[in-house]
Amino acid sequence: MTIEWWQIALLTIYAGFSFYDGNNTTFGTVKPTMAGFFAGLILGDIQTGLIVGGTLNLLVLGVGNFGGASIPDYMTGALLGTAFAIESGKGAEFGVTLAIPIGLLMIQLDVLARFSNTYFQHRAEAYVEKGQFDKAGLMNLLGLIPQSLSRMLPVFLALVFGSVFVQGVVDYMPVWLM
């Protein structure tokens, strides 16, 4: 199966929205099971999506990012693992095998996204000191843009260039980075 451009677009948008959702509306789209289901729905194999997402959801149980700690992003792992499992026809086991290192790799991008978010937070603090609370709220929302992009860009690149690209990135990464 070849992943079509519209499927890449929907999965990329989902990756960005789910991060926003996890910090604001909390519809649950940030959960790996939901991400796997959505990817399976878009790509035509819901069962594989649920198996990949559900397996990754077991890894997330009891894990929280308290105090700003970065945790593996198994939502992105579920999206990409499901997509590659369906695309390759190798099954859910293959998808989970790819999804776990993808989730671990996303920790590093999460750190970069949080770092870039500090610009908006410093502006928000300045607006609060001036009593401009509406602008401070806007800065908090704008701070989600780099964080959403930290999910959207890897999903887009991985889906455009394929699982060989992702496996190559994971294989050439130093162990300390994971």
Describe every region a protein language model picked out.
Residues 2-3, 24, 28, 44, ...:
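Juxtamembrane/transmembrane-helix boundary motifs in multi-pass membrane proteins
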Residues 1-71, 75:
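Hydrophobic transmembrane alpha-helices
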Residues 10-11, 15-18, 64, 76-116, ...:
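Short helix-perturbing small/polar motifs within transmembrane alpha-helices
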Residues 1-8, 39-50, 84-99, 165-174:
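Helix-coil boundary and interhelical linker segments in multi-pass alpha-helical membrane proteins
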Residues 18-23, 44, 60, 85, ...:
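Membrane-water interface at transmembrane helix exits
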Residues 13, 52-59, 67-80, 84, ...:
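Alpha-helical membrane segments and immediately flanking helix-loop junctions
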Residues 97-178:
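Helix-loop-helix junctions within the multi-pass membrane cores of secondary transporters/permeases
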